[in-house]
């Protein structure tokens, strides 16, 4: 059973992560396409995922949510860290490959950005996408983010240095 609804859109629901979601999260994060898209190089095992879950539920400076389509978990989205004093946070997200290109990421980001601005009263949401991830860059631009800069060869993924493109959206 998925966790309680946090934010609901037409096609996705953002829910609290529950312990029963850990197996999905662990399997998804070990998918090479997902891992690459978020800059990971080492797959998580179930114990590492459980540790992540424990940190998430005890951390007041982040919001980490399960993205579901109907009742099916399809990804994760979060705001981290939430800096209330500066009014800024960063959004991070991933969706399992079989749901790419369906608009679920767009709707999930729109929901969480609205939450950041309207409920948390933040001034700015930032995001990053790697140079090879054109789809993520297009998604961010589609929902209104502006590219603010590029850190060249900032991260080492799968044997190659990759650029990191930084985006921002101001309320």
Spans of features found by a protein language model:
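Acyl-donor (CoA/ACP) binding surface of acyl/acetyltransferases
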Residues: 1-13, 17-29, 68-171
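Proline-rich low-complexity regions
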Residues: 2-5, 43, 61
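Structural motif
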Residues: 32-33, 60, 120
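Conserved GNAT-fold acetyl-CoA-binding loop/helix
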Residues: 33-54
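Short, hydrophobic secondary-structure boundary micro-motifs
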Residues: 36-38, 64-67, 164
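A short helix-loop-beta-strand connector motif used in the catalytic cores of GNAT acetyltransferases and
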Residues: 53-66, 75
């Amino acid at each position: 059973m998925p966790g309680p609804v946090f934010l609901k859109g037409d096609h996705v629901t953002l829910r609290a992560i529950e312990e029963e979601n850990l197996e999905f999260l662990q399997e998804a994060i070990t998918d090479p396409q997902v891992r690459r898209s978020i800059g990971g190089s080492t797959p998580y095992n179930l114990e590492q995922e459980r540790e992540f879950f424990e940190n998430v539920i005890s951390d007041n400076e982040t919001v980490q949510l399960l993205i579901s389509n109907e009742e099916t978990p399809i990804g994760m989205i979060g705001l981290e860290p939430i800096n209330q004093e500066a009014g800024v946070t960063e959004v991070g997200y991933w969706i399992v490959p079989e749901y790419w290109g369906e608009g679920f990421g767009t709707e999930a980001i729109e929901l969480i950005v609205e939450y950041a601005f309207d409920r948390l009263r933040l001034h700015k949401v930032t995001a990053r996408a790697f140079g090879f991830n054109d789809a993520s860059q297009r998604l961010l631009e589609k929902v209104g983010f502006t590219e603010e800069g590029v850190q060249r060869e900032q991260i080492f993924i799968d044997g190659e240095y990759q650029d990191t493109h930084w985006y921002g959206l101001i309320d």
